[in-house]
Structure formats: C-alpha cells, structure tokens
UniProtKB/Swiss-Prot annotation:
GO molecular function list: nucleic acid binding
Protein name: UPF0102 protein Tery_0733
Entry similarity comment: Belongs to the UPF0102 family.
The organism of origin for this protein: Trichodesmium erythraeum (strain IMS101)
Listed NCBIfam families: YraN family protein (TIGR00252)
One protein family per Pfam: UPF0102
Highest taxon of the lineage: Bacteria
SUPFAM superfamilies: Restriction endonuclease-like
Length: 180
C-alpha cells in the first residue's frame, strides 16, 4: 500500500519527536532536583540550548565548589537501543562543545543579571524505546499532563506517550572549554 503525499505529511506531523520527549523527561527531573528551568530550546543563529536551568548554592548537595548560583546549559541526547554513539555521549564532540559555548555566550550577552552565576555545561543521556500505542488513559492526557504526573529518577524507566524513557546518565560539568 502506498501513501499519497498528503497522507505522508499527516503521518509525519503526528509522529512524536523522541528528542523532545527526552528533554521533557530531563526538565522534569531537574525540577524535582530543585532546579528552575529558565529556557527550553533557546535558539540563536549559532545553535540551540536544549535546557537552561539555575539552582541556588544553598540547595546543592555539594555547595563547597560554588560561591554563586549555578547556571547549567544542559545538552540532552535521546537515543534508542543499539545506537552507535554510546547513547549520545560521542555526539558531544569538540565541535559541538564549541558551538554550545558560543550559543551560551550569546544567551548570556543579553542577560546581565546572570553575570555572577557559575556556569557549567551538563549532558543528559536518555534511552528511549517504543513500547506500544498509547493506552486509553494516556490518550486522554496531553504530554504535559503525563509529564506532570511522573516521578523521575536516574536509572528508572517511565512510560510516556507510548515510549519507555530512562534518564540513564546525567553528567554535571561534562566538559570545559579551553580558551586559547
């Protein structure tokens, strides 16, 4: 059976973006860990920041390394089983890191109120596998409603929009940019 072009575009528009599901999961986890999400999918001509979040030092488990609130630029990599790049870790190349750095600089240039924040680049690795069509209960809830009901812990799977998602690794201060 072949689909005409209008059927194909309808199918594609209804397909769920698993990358966005991964970002939703990580944002929920960050909120549960006491982070405030400032921006999601912030874009400029240089690139995109998946999540920009802040946390006060008083709410950190190990606050000895930070004198000021933390501003985290979080790169989320969502991958299915059997991927070729170590669940997205190998996709954060030096080139990608430089692009994230430049994008973060542009983000900060318009926000003088964040000048004293300790900035870092974190990487969140999410596994995502299609499991089945949405249950009747899930079909009645938007993705936002489904997310609001989730409890997210590193290493534990959750079901969202017919997918099984696992935040399997969160790497704080995943890389440092060396300025030459």
């Amino acid at each position: 059976m072949s689909l005409d072009s209008s059927s194909k575009s309808t199918f594609i528009s209804q397909k769920i973006d698993t990358g966005i599901l991964g970002e939703e999961l990580v944002a929920k986890w960050l909120n549960l860990e006491g982070w405030q999400i400032l921006h999601r999918r912030w874009q400029c001509p240089w690139g995109e920041l998946d999540i920009v979040a802040t946390k006060t030092t008083s709410s950190l488990r190990d606050s000895s390394n930070y004198k000021f609130p933390i501003l985290a630029f979080v790169e989320v990599k969502t991958r299915s089983r059997g991927n070729w790049d170590q669940d997205g870790l190998l996709a954060v190349t030096e080139s990608k890191q430089a692009k994230l750095w430049k994008t973060a600089e542009i983000f900060l240039s318009d926000r003088p109120e964040l000048v004293d924040y300790s900035c870092r680049f974190d990487v969140a690795l999410v596994r995502c596998n299609y499991i089945r069509k949405n249950s009747q209960a899930q079909k009645k809830l938007s993705i936002e409603q489904q997310i609001s009901e989730l409890t997210v812990d590193i290493g534990n799977s959750v079901e969202l929009a017919g997918y099984q998602l696992v935040l399997h690794n969160y790497i704080a201060s995943a890389f440092i940019i060396h300025l030459d």
